[in-house]
C-alpha cells in the first residue's frame, strides 16, 4: 500500500476524485432541497431530478466508453471538469434571471460528462498502477466513496442550509477547477502504439465483440445485469421498509443509508487488506450470497436493529463485489479497450436497474413488500450461476492483447 501512495498518477486521480465527490454531494443535496422548496415537495419534480441523473448514464455510456478509448484520457478528464465549471456558471446566470428549471439541465450535463471521465480514469490506472497493486487501488477508491456516502449528505446539507443555493454553486466551481488543476499534473499521455481507428459505430461493436468473446467478461456482464434488476426493485422501496415494516417515520431511512455506507467503508478496508490474498471468484460468490440473504431478512424484519445490521452487511458485500469486479475489469481488459468494455457493461447494469425501478411500485401494489424483496433475493441467487462458471487464470490476463488484435483483424 505504501508503494501505491508513492504513485504520483494514482494520488492525483484520488485527489481529483475527492474534490469531485465533495462537489457531487454538495450539488445533489442543494438541488434536491431547492427543488423541494420550489415545488412544495412535488414527487414528480424530485423523480425528474433522479431521471436526469441516471438516464444519461444509461444512454451516453455506450458512446462515452468508445470515445474515451480514442481520446487522450488526461485531456478528457481535465476537459470534463472545465465543462462542469462552464455548465454551473451558465446555471448561476439562468437562476439570476429566475429560470430555476435550469437546475434539471445542470444535473443532465454533470451526468453526461461523467460518462467520459470514468473510463478515462480506468485507463490511467491501467497504464500507471502495477498489476499487483490494482486490487488495493480499487479498494482505496471504494473506501473513499463509502466515506462520502456517510458524510457527503451531511456536508451537502450543511453547505446549503448555512450558505444557501448560490454559495453552494460557487463552491462547485472552485472544487471542479481544483480538480482540473490536480489532473493537469498527471504524466503526459503518449499512446504506446498507434491503433488504426474505425468509425465510432464499429468501435462500439468491437466493445461488444470483446465482451462476447471473453468468457469471464461475458459472465460478469450477465451477473451485473441481474444484480441491476434486483437493486432496481429494492432501492425505491427502502422508504416503505421504514414505514410499513419498521413502523418509523420516513426520515429514518437515512439511518439505513448510514449503516450501508459504514458497511461499504469497512468492506473497502477489508478488501484492501485481503483482495490480493483471496481468490476473487470466492469473494464474489460469498459477497453475493450474503447480499441475497440480506434482501430476504430486510423484507421480513420488523426490527430496526436487525434491518440496520443486514444493511451494514449489504454494504460490506457490495464493497467486496465492486472491488473484485473493478479489479478484474482492469486486469482482464487491454488498455485500448477499457473504455469500450465499460461502455458495454455499465449501460446493461443501469438499464436493468431502471427497469427494476419502473416495476418496483407496481409489483408492490400487486403483491407485497415482502414478496418484492424475496424476488430480489432470488435474482441475486440466480446471478451467482454465471460467477461459478468463471475461470480466472493467469493466461487470461497475459493473453488479453492477443484477443484484442484478433478481434481488430476481423
Could you describe each region identified by the protein language model?
Residues 32-38, 92-93, 151-171, 244-245, ...:
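Transmembrane alpha-helix termini and helix-breaking/packing motifs in multi-pass membrane transporters
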Residues 93-106, 299-311:
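Helix-loop junctions at membrane interfaces in 12-TM secondary transporters
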Residues 1-55, 214-260:
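Helix-loop boundary and gating motifs at the non-cytosolic
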Residues 123, 127, 165, 169-198, ...:
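Helix-loop junctions on the cytosolic side of multi-pass membrane transporters
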Residues 32, 88-95, 156, 160, ...:
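Structural signal for membrane-spanning alpha-helices in multi-pass inner-membrane proteins
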Residues 58-61, 70, 74-76, 80, ...:
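C-terminal transmembrane bundle of multi-pass solute transporters/carriers
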Residues 11-29, 52-66, 72-87, 102-161, ...:
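Substrate-agnostic recognition of the 12-TM MFS/MFS-like secondary transporter fold
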Residues 1-10, 189-221, 406-409:
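Juxtamembrane intracellular "pre-TM" segments in multi-pass secondary transporters
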